[in-house]
Design a protein with these regions (language model features):
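Acidic, histidine-bearing metal-coordination/catalytic regions of metal-dependent phosphoesterases
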Residues: 1-138, 156-173, 180-247, 282, ...
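Active-site neighborhood of phospho(di)ester-bond hydrolases with catalytic His/Asp-centered motifs
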Residues: 111-113, 137-144, 148, 168-176, ...
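Active-site environment of divalent metal-dependent phosphoester hydrolases
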Residues: 118-120, 147-150, 177-184, 264-267, ...
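Short, conserved loop/helix-junction motifs that constitute active-site signature segments
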Residues: 163-167, 315-318, 340-343
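Short, flexible/disordered intra-domain loops and linkers
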Residues: 184-192, 297-307, 363
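Short acidic-hydrophobic surface loop/beta-edge motif
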Residues: 247-251, 333-341
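Active-site-proximal segments of metal-dependent phosphoesterases and phosphodiesterases across multiple
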Residues: 263-273, 277-323, 422-425, 434-459
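Catalytic Cys-His active-site segments of thiol-dependent hydrolases/isopeptidases
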Residues: 344-359
């Protein structure tokens, strides 16, 4: 493992400081053998996708698939509103003063994705996040700040309260769920917009499909300024200066570029032009996106309204991108994609495990995409842990909790190794035995060999939220200097022994080259 990470994935980092190590090392490191449930894992308000209300509030995503995506039109209205309020184009670049250590510029930040359920699974990430990142310069929430539909009234319980102890600014990129109220809550709380002044969309519907979409579309309640919730985190030292759903953070050694991918349509012309322009600057860059460019063994380059793709911009050698990180999918994945003319691979990362229900990694087929093979690919949770986790969910929901559908972690790891022809991650799983009952359960839960994205599993994954350890949540800590970017993925298991010392699940160091 170490030699592979040192060649294709960058320089391998040290193991976690926890005595149990990480999920690569032991069942305890994965959270299967909690000494005690963490305090933060028992907090928060209940939230469940089993409730039909959140599903109905999230109906706009299905309407987009049927009738088209209005995100670009609505984003243009927001940008027009901000300009009329005195916003200037240069306000899209927020300057974050770097620290100086031994005469060199340094910056550190936390990235956490898909956070906003407000329940125990979100709160369980907070204490490990503070333990691993209280000293960082800022945080970025990457996609889906507020579930189920981005409402302005949900920010206290699902954004302000959970991260109240984080002392530095928190920036954010909207996800599809934040767009379900037309981005009203996001623009009010995170961009300081006067949302009561937003004009209605111009023109009459041009087709029957558009008329039907407008009829069924979930819209936010119209509110006057006096009816809106109070903004918080406005004091000196925690104020961001963010004014738009897309922006760049000039941190000194690194330019952090964040784009708004809306609900799934192409990037609008205005944002695409800005992205191309900001990418021409000389500094090394990391791109943050609502939706990842590589995910579940597939490449999604993401089209732009005026032609080309987001990935075209990332791959341009003159733009000096070293990584592209997206949320939306609720786990961790890393694809070190080799690029011609570069000494180091370009790191494509999924990091959406900040609180929402866990997206199954056992659904990911054996990886062979963009020059990345299974030997190069990293995911968290490991596929066997994911299958074992989901077997407990299915058993609880459909098996009456009798244990008929449960698959032990070792058996699940052996099953996935057999199915995909891969090696189990943990040493203790290498001699894994699959009993007849466990094999029958696994065959039922995972019916198609190597098929990781069936509608069957996607449907149930949204319903089977879980708030008990192991939770398999994650956050990233990114440290940049003038010579390298270091990206670490830490786990939040929900176990008390991991709260103050979160397991390190993955690490990559990227040497920086200045143009």
């Amino acid at each position: 493992m170490a030699s592979r990470e040192e060649t294709r994935n960058g320089t391998a980092g040290p193991r976690s400081r926890t005595s149990a190590g990480s999920s690569r090392d032991s069942l305890a490191g994965a959270g299967w053998r909690c000494e005690e449930v963490g305090v933060s894992a028992s907090g928060g308000r209940p939230f469940s996708w089993m409730n039909p209300v959140p599903l109905w509030q999230s109906r706009n995503q299905n309407l987009v698939r049927l009738f088209g995506d209005p995100t670009n039109e609505e984003r243009r209205l927001w940008m027009k509103l901000q300009r009329e309020a005195g916003w200037l184009p240069e306000d899209l670049i927020v300057r974050v003063p770097p620290r100086r250590e031994a005469g060199r510029q340094k910056v550190s930040f936390i990235l956490v994705g898909d956070t906003g359920e407000g329940d125990a699974s979100q709160r369980a990430v907070v204490k490990p996040l503070l333990a691993g990142g209280r000293d960082t310069d800022f945080m970025v929430v990457c996609s889906d700040v507020i579930y189920p539909a981005g409402d302005a009234g949900d920010y206290d319980a699902k954004f302000y309260e959970p991260y109240d102890d984080y002392p530095s600014p928190i920036y954010a990129l909207p996800g599809n769920h934040d767009w379900y109220d037309g981005l009203v809550g996001f623009m009010h709380h995170l961009c300081g917009a006067d949302v009561s002044a937003l004009p209605a969309a111009e023109g009459r519907p041009s087709s029957f499909k558009e008329r039907l979409r407008r009829l069924l579309w979930r819209r936010p309640a119209r509110r006057g300024p006096e009816d809106l919730p109070v903004r918080r985190r406005t004091e000196e030292g925690r104020r961001t200066g963010q004014r738009s759903p897309y922006f760049a953070l000039d941190t000194g050694p690194l330019l952090v570029v964040g784009i708004d991918t809306g609900m799934g349509g192409p990037i609008d012309r205005e944002q695409a032009g800005w992205l191309r322009g900001i990418s021409r600057t000389d500094k090394p860059k990391v791109l943050l996106t609502g939706k990842p460019l590589y995910v579940d063994g597939e490449h999604h380059p993401y089209p732009m309204e005026d032609g080309g793709t987001v990935d075209d911009v990332v791959l341009d050698p003159n733009h000096n991108y070293v990584a592209a990180i997206g949320g939306d999918i609720h786990n961790y994945q890393r694809y070190p994609v080799p690029v011609g003319g570069r000494d180091e691979p370009l790191q494509y990362i999924v990091s959406g495990g900040g609180g929402a229900y866990m997206s199954a990694t056992h659904r990911i087929p054996k990886v062979d995409v963009g020059g990345v093979t299974e030997d190069d690919f990293i995911c968290y949770p490991r596929r066997g842990d994911s299958l074992s986790f989901y077997s407990k969910l299915y058993d609880r929901r459909l098996g009456l909790g009798m244990g008929w559908l449960e698959i032990a972690p070792g058996e699940a790891a052996a099953y996935m190794a057999e199915r995909l022809g891969i090696k189990p991650a943990r040493p203790e799983d290498h001699e894994g035995y699959i009993g007849k009952r466990a094999r029958r359960a696994a065959d039922w839960i995972f019916p198609l060999p190597g098929s990781g994205r069936t509608h069957y599993h996607h449907f149930f994954s949204e319903f089977f939220d879980w708030n008990d350890p192991p939770l398999f949540k994650n956050f990233l800590r990114i440290d940049a200097s003038e010579s390298e970017v270091r990206i670490r993925c830490f786990a939040a298991t929900g176990c008390a022994e991991h709260e103050d010392d979160p397991p390190l699940e993955d690490e990559v160091r990227i040497p920086l080259q200045r143009k």
